Amino acid sequence: MSELRPTKPLEGVRFILPYGGEDYPEQLMDIPDPPKKLYGIGNPQVLTCGLSVIGARKATPYGRDVAFKFAKIASEHGVTIISGGALGCDSAAHRGCLEGESPTVVVLGGGCDRIYPESNRDLFQEVVDKGGAVISEHQWQFPPMPYTFRARNRIIAGLSRATLIVEAGLPSGTFSTADDALSSNREVLVVPGAITSPTSRGANRLLYQGATPIVDEETFEDVIFNLYGCLKVQDMRKKEIGETSLLFAALQAEQLSIDALMEKDDIGAPLREKRLAWLMVELAKLEHLSLIHISEPT
């Protein structure tokens, strides 16, 4: 693995975030042994409290389908998906997030100019092109090695408010990410699998040890709502309500004041142009769709 030749560099804006710097992710400061620097390509603003989705590299069709499905659901709720870019469940999670139209973050084991696996280069470029980021704690040309993949798992868990484990055998490197999540006081969610499936033995063991089970879409949406404050999409599709989708996405992602909404790049311009009248109309639409509830002033 250390003899991998450098791949064609990803195209995009490059950034370096030193520990304690203005744009360094605050949630990483709380983990044991936070990275001294983050090197990245893409948008550093997406390194917020997302959801990590991980699982087996040699995933079954079930594992890949579930990773894609739940990543897409979370993405449709405005949640950023964070994973390691590996084959199998990781790749499926990144693709599901892109399908749901939210940005996704790839945390590499080597430097950002040493793409691994090389077969995922086009996927990583799409991640960058669609507003996400590819990051590493190592310098650009640092080669991926077995120990660097174990070490990067703490970053995947640390950037996330919760970690969803889709498939994991015994033994499994996925357990290290679960351990990192628990040591950083993050939630561990697990999708159960057949007890006869080798790729689900580790996941089922984590459930036995007390991880939160995710058994269907409804339980997943409930957990997403509780962890991220996201509103349920129900039968509404963002594109069907025009400009209201901008407001809806902003409200899903975080609780914001009117002033804070105006500062957001994607929705600030419409707000500044149309001001309060537009805002009240759009909020009324969302309430009519039963997506939000506007309480009376006390």
Which stretches of residues belong to each language-model region?
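Glycine-biased, small-residue-rich flexible motifs in mid-sequence functional cores and linkers
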Residues: 3-295
